[in-house]
């Protein structure tokens, strides 16, 4: 309703004889008119919700944010020291009492906050179920949670972000009938992709897309990326490429559930149908789901009779979004597609990227797609409880003290500790790497997002090829197998960098 831009209303006041029975079109909301056009923003303090029965008193909220007079954000605030759970429990209580009905049913996003913590979540509707698994903390580009209320106000609840969140980053999922709002990392990825496409010089011959490394939520993010591109008219076609029929069927079902009422996501039963939809100028054929096999067949089918079609399609601005990119990039099919359509821009989504040390024939993620646009690794997902966690334990093949000393000697260009300490220049370097306050054991991102190396970052992978390390791994498995497998009840996966 809100993203429908306009709504028709028939006047029904019989006393207004001049207009009775006539229809008028009311402009309610335009997702593109951000801080511009006819958009108006207002803040309501302490809105009063009439009680739904004589047994219930009127309820008083804390804040509402209005766009064009419609309440789209509802905020419940608590003072310092009061857990934020009390704020969202109060929202749930109001919802169960029927407060958010009528005009107030237009609330899209709830925000529960105290000065030190904020969570936001989509309105599940009058029949929906509140689920804390979908209560999110906003974070910065590097996935560091933002909780200070001043930063939340300026980065999440301000214009343009609040307008964009309602217009572009919520999804009315037809699959379960529940409104969904995107997490911060999904927003950063989708907006980064849209930004790259908007700045692309299509005839430069140097256009590159990018790589998204996300451990969860990839399907919604990839769809929203495509939707942003289509709505901006920055590309003629956005094609979702999968490398398996099962993935394609699943993706098509999910994309269609995410689509707005006026959007169509096209399937392709064969290569001929794919060619037809790629050539089409119909708006309904903008978003297409197909397989990498069908796309690569366009060049080879019918002995080159597709030349004219390829020429027509090649003139279009094409964006290809590759699902599970770590699988699809191997082999010759992606190379064939790039050769057939040299103007195309590729974006890859994966939770397990292919790094340079594991790549074959320039098939690392950055070689195929371009620079990494955003990262939400499994470590971020475990911290935020968006993916299943691990129960790790560490078995030391080498003592941390010995590893640190070996790195310190190497950096000091010394063979022994005595050799390092007898030379002032070498000693300064040696002490730097021996000092945990200057060089930590493990690397971590700095304030600017750049990686600060730790001792382990200076170690070569060859240490894991030594007989000493291999023997320690084998002994640990043997000694603990009965306990960890619950006497053989469970199997195990052995992960290694090389066989």
Name each model-derived stretch.
Residues 286-322, 327-336:
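Conserved RecA-like ASCE ATPase "motif II neighborhood" in helicase/translocase motors
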Residues 214-216, 324-328, 340-358, 385:
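Conserved helicase ATPase motor motifs in RecA-like P-loop NTPase domains
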């Amino acid at each position: 309703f809100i993203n429908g831009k306009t709504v028709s209303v028939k006047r029904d006041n019989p006393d207004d004889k001049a207009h009775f029975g006539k229809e008028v079109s009311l402009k309610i909301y335009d997702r593109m008119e951000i801080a511009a056009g006819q958009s108006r923003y207002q803040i309501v303090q302490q809105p009063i919700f009439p009680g739904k029965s004589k047994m219930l008193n009127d309820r008083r909220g804390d804040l509402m944010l209005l766009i064009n007079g419609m309440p789209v954000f509802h905020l419940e605030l608590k003072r310092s020291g009061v857990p934020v759970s009390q704020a969202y429990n109060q929202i749930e209580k109001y919802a169960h009492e029927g407060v958010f009905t009528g005009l107030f049913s237009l609330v899209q996003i709830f925000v529960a906050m105290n000065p030190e913590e904020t969570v936001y979540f989509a309105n599940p509707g009058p029949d929906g179920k509140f689920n804390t698994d979908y209560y999110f903390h906003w974070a910065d580009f590097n996935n560091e949670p933002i909780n200070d209320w001043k930063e939340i106000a300026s980065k999440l609840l301000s214009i343009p972000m609040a307008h964009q969140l309602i217009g572009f980053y919520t999804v009315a999922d037809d699959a379960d009938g529940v409104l969904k709002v995107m997490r911060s990392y999904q927003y950063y990825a989708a907006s980064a992709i849209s930004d790259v496409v908007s700045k692309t010089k299509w005839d430069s011959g140097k256009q590159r897309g990018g790589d998204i490394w996300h451990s969860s939520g990839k399907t919604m993010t990839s769809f929203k990326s495509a939707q942003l591109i289509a709505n901006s008219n920055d590309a003629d076609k956005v094609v979702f490429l999968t490398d398996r029929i099962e993935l394609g069927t699943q993706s098509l079902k999910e994309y269609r559930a995410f689509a707005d009422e006026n959007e169509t996501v096209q399937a392709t039963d064969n290569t001929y149908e794919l060619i037809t939809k790629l050539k089409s100028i119909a708006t309904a054929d903008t978003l297409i789901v197909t397989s990498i096999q069908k796309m690569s067949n366009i060049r080879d089918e019918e002995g080159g009779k597709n030349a004219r079609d390829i020429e027509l399609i090649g003139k279009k601005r094409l964006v290809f979004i590759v699902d599970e990119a770590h699988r699809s990039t191997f082999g010759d099919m992606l190379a064939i597609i790039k050769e057939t359509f040299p103007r195309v821009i590729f974006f890859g989504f994966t939770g397990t990227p292919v790094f340079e040390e594991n790549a074959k024939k320039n098939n690392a993620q950055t070689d195929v797609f371009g620079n990494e646009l955003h990262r939400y690794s499994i470590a971020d997902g475990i911290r935020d409880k968006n993916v299943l966690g691990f129960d790790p334990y560490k078995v030391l093949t080498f003592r941390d003290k010995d590893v640190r000393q070996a790195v310190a000697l190497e950096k000091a260009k010394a063979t022994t500790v005595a050799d390092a300490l007898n030379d002032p220049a070498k000693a300064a370097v040696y002490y730097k790497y021996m000092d945990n306050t200057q060089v930590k054991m493990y690397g971590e991102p700095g304030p600017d997002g750049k990686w600060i190396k730790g001792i382990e970052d200076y170690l070569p992978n060859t240490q894991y090829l030594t007989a000493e390390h291999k023997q320690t791994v084998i002994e640990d498995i043997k000694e603990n197998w009965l306990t960890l497998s619950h006497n053989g009840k469970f199997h195990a996966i052995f992960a290694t960098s090389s066989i």
